[in-house]
Amino acid sequence: MPFALYLDAAETRVEIPSDELCDATLVCGFLGCDLRPFNPLIETLPRLMHLRAEEGQDWVAQYMRQVVAESKHKRLGGEAMLERMSEMMFIDAVRRYIEALPETSRGWLAGLRDRFVGRVLALMHDAPADAWTVDELGRRVGLSRSALHERFAELIGQTPIQYLANWRIQVGAALLRNTSSTVAMVAQEVGYESEATFTKAFKRLTGNSPALWRRRIGSGASVGNHRKIK
């Protein structure tokens, strides 16, 4: 995207051997996310997304100009503005990436786009504590049990119930991080009948017990090796 047409960014000249002369402006930034044991969006995104300038994307260039201005001048409320604008540009980038995915794509983003699997994901995300079965999920979206099981596994790489179990741990980790609820209360909120069952599932996914996870997150220490979901 030709941001050089719009931005007066701080300049650093880099000499690159070339037979052609050209100017380019690089605007660098960082957008972080909370540490979670299971983040399907981040795991699915490629290391590099190349999004070209398109008609109707003028607002992105305007946002980039404002981002640079806020970064330079450190005005009141600037940090909050940078956070919101960065989030909006990230959402737009992910949306455009999903829209450009080939029909044969596989993975969480492809599942999100699918009219059946996407609705199943939304159901589980909205109510992770519900006693979902593949039969009930299929009934909600208009697919048979076998058809949903096959379609979900083909796109996501897991069965619906495997995904639900991992998503419950994701939600539980957020509750442990952001609330003072006991482990037993968190277990109940995400659909586990007992603290022991939740603790076992949590440790299997993260390598840490819920209590240890909470202590290490609170202290800023490493929480160990997170196991990639397969």
Residue ranges with predicted function:
Residues 42-68:
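A short, charged helix-loop
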Residues 37-47, 104-108, 188, 201, ...:
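Glycine-rich, flexible loop/turn motifs
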Residues 8, 61, 65, 118-121:
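Generic alpha-helical structural signal
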Residues 22-24, 58-62, 84:
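Residues forming well-ordered secondary-structure scaffolds
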Residues 49-57, 71-86, 90-130, 134-141, ...:
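Short, Lys/Arg-enriched, Trp-marked, Pro/Gly-tolerant hinge/linker segments that flank
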Residues 119-126, 130-138, 143-144, 150-199, ...:
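Terminal helix-turn-helix DNA-binding modules in bacterial transcription factors
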Residues 21-25, 39, 47-55, 223-224:
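A short, N-terminal "cap"/entry segment at the start of jelly-roll beta-barrel domains
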Residues 1-43:
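N-terminal regulatory/effector-sensing and dimerization cores
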